[in-house]
């Protein structure tokens, strides 16, 4: 109950419940938007004293507002050279707080990467949250109404930016990117500074993800022109691989005073847990630094599958089908014959890039989430084989780094990773903190109070440092 002289600071809980119970459909959203469009976007403080019927109108209007602007969810798709230059000019020491052993929130470089990855990143299915991606859900006005209601409960303004941020956490979770500056600090501390006498340094990233570490390796080479930085990563996602090569091509041609000549980058389209990822056994390669931040839980990320396709060409020769860059073909690729790759069956005739083939076999590259049915299984199918490969690949005196965090669906992940690494012969030398970004606002509790996300979850993730 609000007293006569009390100042109300939030929307009443009963109004939020009233919004929840009064979804009136897409047509009503359009009608309400026509009525309220001149006032959009509403700030949170403008909503506090609205009566329950008007606030329901505003919720419907905001739903149509976000629907109209849904294409903006991918952000700026133009390549931002300024963001790249800002990263290259940033001092590496700003990325780490020595007193708290924390990799701090330094977002330089993410704006540059967004032009290459944002649309694909939003199209990644979060497998343990259902089959729909963030992009899919942006077409559903009933879902967007729920987003608006959630934003009000979190006490945020109904701006496009705030609504898009909220959409990522309603009935799902979008995949995040590791900040390039934080990764660059790890490359400096455990790569450059730990090996002052080496002119050539090799880094392996077992799970590439969305290219934050790739960009940090470019930064590291730029800041250390006397060192040759060779970067190799692995990832089964065709979307990641194609974006990887787009970024590499762009950076390789980036010139002027920021030209980098002491850097090479390569990616292999397979997991870190397969025999092909034992680079020492297969290619004689050793790495001074191995580090990754993999999917945190069984089924967390579900990318479009890719396939290893073996076929017979018109001359009767056995061939393996890849695209022009040597990448395996995505399940959604439409072949010249009009059939998608995922629909091919053994013995099918098909045409690709103007050449005729007959399919002999098609093997799904697979992802860890599809290989096991429990967290224990995923530990043994993915983590342990990856650690075994890392042990084979690590140079004498090298460092292996894991950034993981306990999550609802795998509540012992941190302990499991440390245990498995120790069982395979590694020693835990240090633990750093990776400072997390925060969604503004608060979460409504059952008793009607609100708690900030910082109160509900620790504001950092551990970064485990291992040596042999």
Locate predicted features.
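Class I S-adenosyl-L-methionine-dependent methyltransferase catalytic core
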Residues: 1-83, 89-468
